[in-house]
């Protein structure tokens, strides 16, 4: 029995040693924890009105604690409509290498979802924001987390949540953690909908990244929102990559970008919040629905190695500055 015990221990060590030769050593998390997050499934109207009567649900977050001691900075990673994909893992390793822990949320599995690309109506567009604030509650009390240095980063639908989680109005309604995110880093977010008081954002930097060729969530709309935010004196910047389409940082994406005929996009819609809690299709003057004629299919998605590398370089430099890393 002793020899069997020794074999069982030695084999993982051999495998780990082999992996360590391929993965930069600092990219290996010192510890990984899975945390349950108690949240709600809400309609957009419920979210916008602060209505807590949604369906209780438990989602999961993967906390990868970077190598280091004491309390470390954390980047919360929020996936998009396709779920927890390869880019989340890549970013986790890249950030761990800097000495930054990561908390990657899976907002779908606990809700019985795998993706909403082909049916965006399955989940409220802003529901992820509640998940993110609840994740803050988990992190704020964790002994290995510096609660003053928690950054939010999200992709596509998760980028939309990242961007609008900065709104002071939404923080007042839903953030009960006692802390705020130190910065917001949305990747290719949906900026299509003006919300009431949407220029009143947290006094924290916002850095948006997207591609000129994005026909899922056009960056032109984000640039217009950025101009409104700047006019209001906010610290916000947008970085645009001319050759990049949607999801350009996913290393398993199509090369070149390919059409996904079943995926829904609101790129042709003009949606706005007219009265608190009510999203209106500006063309029909009726409440917006994903059955509206403006909703189209077939955006391009694909990996752009050059844009992905440039974005990694920019994000790392930004995080080093905002988190005061040595």
Where are the predicted features?
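N-terminal cap/lid segment of alpha/beta-hydrolase-fold proteins
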Residues: 21-69
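Sec-dependent signal peptide recognition
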Residues: 2-10
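Hydrophobic h-region of N-terminal signal peptides that target proteins for export
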Residues: 12-20
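Short alpha-helix in the alpha/beta-hydrolase fold that links the catalytic acid
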Residues: 218-228
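C-terminal catalytic histidine-bearing segment of alpha/beta-hydrolase fold enzymes
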Residues: 235-326
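Short beta-strand/loop motif that positions the catalytic acidic residue
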Residues: 208-210
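Primarily recognizes the serine-hydrolase "nucleophile elbow" in alpha/beta-hydrolase
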Residues: 124-202, 213-216, 220
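Serine-hydrolase catalytic machinery in alpha/beta-hydrolase-like enzymes
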Residues: 48-62, 71-141, 261, 290-300
